[in-house]
Amino acid sequence: MYHDGHNVTVIDLQSEAFRRLGSKFRGQRIIGNGIDEEVLKRAGVEKCDVFVSVTQGDNRNIMAAQIAKIVYNVKTVISRINDPVRADIYRAHGIITICGTTILSGLLRDFLATGEWAIAKDYNAEYLALNV
């Protein structure tokens, strides 16, 4: 997203995690908890157009997404959720969910049936919403 000209802020509890962004990343890095409102304010949540939560944990992702959507009225909120049942529930509450479990199982199922890899967007309707 940064390379496409968007202003990007990344929040992580561990400063070492920022190494994964690569040396060319010029966005803002904030060490902190993504469900802490003071940290979110420092990151500019009050004026952001899109909020994406992609930690390793479903609970933290959904909490951060709900804070962004409900408290700060962020228009587009996207959250990575590993549990397909939870993903469906949160989607029903207006949060765009990306469920790797659903995407991967669909890809594997169809590859085993056809011998060809399909495009991931066919397995998670919310993927289409990423073109914001």
Per-segment meaning from a language model:
Residues 1-132:
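Cytosolic regulatory regions of ion transport systems
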